Amino acid sequence: VELSMSYEAQGADELVLLDVSATPEGRSHQHDTVRQVREALGIPLTCGGGVREADDAGRLLEAGADKVSVNTAAVTNPGLIGELAKRYGSQCTVVAIDAARRDGEGWELVVRSGKDRTGKDVIEWAREIVDRGAGEILLTSWDRDGTRSGYELDLLTAVSEAVTVPVIASGGAATPQHLVEALQAGGDAVLAASIFHDGEYTVQTLKEELRRAGVEVRL
């Protein structure tokens, strides 16, 4: 909660709270944590992890989430996307895409924190989830996640050009230039974690760098 408040004070536009171990461990999201964070924050909050059915998403929204992100459950049950969009609205329905580069060409959809390959083509899956009602895509390159080598720009461009909904770039950011490159490559927004957790940059200093690079941001 304190970390969330710190990020808001630094100028974060939105907070994404992902319980990445919830699905592999077969449990639901920690709703008490969501409530505490919601009570402390004024900015939009997206929550994900452990969402296996529409009621799980409903409980997160009741706890204070503005949007709910689904990943593995959307792959095993694609109809869930439409159910979420119908019940709560596309504006609340975020589908996370975890992509791994194929040996040949393109990218394959992976699930369970990158552990399992699905055989699905990422671009085709992106189009399908938008057709089913996803209002936003959270796109992570598992080849870049944690590497601090920058976002996978060709993946970001390919997905952004294939769909009509906002695409948020995730995975690999370590410098302000990485964020600039992602936005120039077609990302509608950028998500960063370790770059802030490590204390190397604040949200404010990154935004100032983005503005100097010609990116419109709210300081």
Q: Model regions: which residues?
A:
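C-terminal helical cap(s) of enzyme catalytic domains, especially alpha/beta-barrels
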Residues: 80-88, 179-219
